[in-house]
């Protein structure tokens, strides 16, 4: 029997232990996609308490708490910070088998150094007190934690109308060495069926100083804002393709679709597909021209609980996995981009693990000469961001492509404590390769496999995104 969460956690072969401790453990973090608030980094935010840094805004924890029968007031409601933390602590022992149990205790270990206590109802007060004491120290501010965790690059998620002033503040401070760059997330300009689409287009036009009445105007406004993002170091875009669609249309048709929508009309299913396709094709050309990486997050079924959506809004833990068809529309979209000026570097993520092999084989259709791993099958995302999910994703990538060219892990998180997910990923990666060696499926060549692990942990991403650190 192995003790829980030792220095060799998940490393069940000698080769895995060598890979992790000699090649993976000390690698810096290149967190190319996250949802950290840039304002907190700019002001070097000092967290009020453990709830503020750990539970606030964490829909993973809220889902577990609701499943445990916890009242909503202790998740998103009016209970005090200490009461909410207590409700979480009471839930934690019930999360064994869920990645939250591992994440929770990895996060207590790093950066707080708590290795002697498991979180529960009876230990909550002790952990609350110890962590709050540390959070008052300079090394536990937003920037302090990023420094402790050796984070070299962070890609935030930003709307085209954002002024990016916080990124300017960060970039102007030479004492802070972590690169914090915006990522372009234009979903609100793309989701023509959304209730607030027309209102958003007015805001976009105002910020870009473009009167948007035709499709070409929308493209011009987006170009203006992409120039603004590029001036702030942006090299990455991200799209939530909850359902992948494809439909072709000429300019006159697109103008009509947009005009009717801005006049209060409701677009039909075909019109939505035509409009979204046109936006993605235009943006794909721009990304290619600018040398940006595009990311497609595919397959979320959002806002399933109408009463809770109306009460609390989006992104509060009522989303799940979609099962809409992916292969044909995605193939047509990527092929059209290839024909329409060339396909830029692309990372595809799927929320439904049913689609792993779809994406794993799809990327092989569009790889590019002179660019190793131009098309990427992204790391296990959201509900797949756990041991089995990451093992499946990496195994299928290895079987269908080149694991050695994988750009590795990202937190996709709103929490400054989530950097231990990189550690979790690295341990799982080393466990998997170590088992291959133990079973005679890979050579016991520590230099070869150690270099591969090092590349996946950091160097591949650094090269792929071409961001100077």
UniProtKB/Swiss-Prot annotation:
First-level EC class: isomerase
Lineage top rank: taxon: Bacteria
**Biological pathway:** Carbohydrate metabolism; pentose and glucuronate interconversion
Keyword terms: Isomerase
InterPro entries cross-referenced by the UniProt entry: Metal_Hydrolase (IPR032466), Uronate_isomerase (IPR003766)
Q: Where does the UniProt annotation place the signal sequence?
A: none
NCBIfam families linked to this entry:
PRK02925.1 (NF002794)
Q: What's the protein called, per UniProt?
A: Uronate isomerase
Question: What organism is the protein native to?
Answer: Edwardsiella ictaluri (strain 93-146)
Gene responsible for this protein: uxaC
